[in-house]
Regions:
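Short aromatic-glycine motifs in intrinsically disordered, low-complexity regions
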Residues: 8-18, 79-81
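Hydrophobic beta-strand-centered segment that forms part of the acyl-chain substrate-binding groove
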Residues: 4, 68-107
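Compact, glycine-rich, soluble single-domain proteins
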Residues: 50-69, 86-87
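Catalytic strand-loop segment that frames the active site of acyl-thioester-processing enzymes
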Residues: 19-54
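Hydrophobic residues on conserved beta-strands that form the core of alpha/beta folds
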Residues: 24-25, 89, 119, 133
Length: 142
């Protein structure tokens, strides 16, 4: 399903996070296998330091992209959105931290899903520039 759903258009229905800890502005595309989101970094973001989004902020944005996919799947199945946790971060690589005002575009693609555990590859770009990759192991609770 491809669409542009912005923060004022029900992203809160798909992810459990709430302001000021929401790191997605737009859900560009979502399916059972992947999600594509965007986030323009505001100066007052809680994980901004010295004009840059922190590594923790990059990781949280990737995790929320994964949560958007999971929330969409849960909604398609008639379920409520479940709370999820990062169980492991593997192979996190960054070329730089993004600056305030830049827009992150992150794709999360499911590698493996077993019951409530997902292994997801995440790629984050600013424009055409690849700035971060990681593999997240995520768990949801019932």
């Amino acid at each position: 399903m491809t669409f542009g759903m912005n923060a004022t258009h029900n992203i809160a229905e798909w992810i459990p996070q709430r302001p000021p800890f929401v790191f997605i502005d737009t859900i560009v595309d979502v399916s059972e296998e992947h999600a594509l989101t965007q986030f323009t970094i505001p100066a007052d973001c809680v994980l901004v330091s010295d004009g840059c989004l922190s590594l923790a902020g990059l990781m949280e944005h990737a995790a929320q992209t994964c949560a958007a996919r999971a929330g969409w799947v849960q909604r398609q199945q008639g379920q409520q959105v479940k709370i999820g946790y990062i169980g492991a971060v593997k192979q996190m690589q960054t070329t730089r931290l993004p600056h305030v005002g830049e827009t992150l575009t992150t794709e999360a693609r499911v590698i493996q899903q077993v019951l409530n555990i997902s292994l997801v590859d995440c790629i984050t770009r600013v424009g055409d520039e690849l700035i971060a990759t990681t593999t997240l192991k995520l768990a949801t609770i019932d």
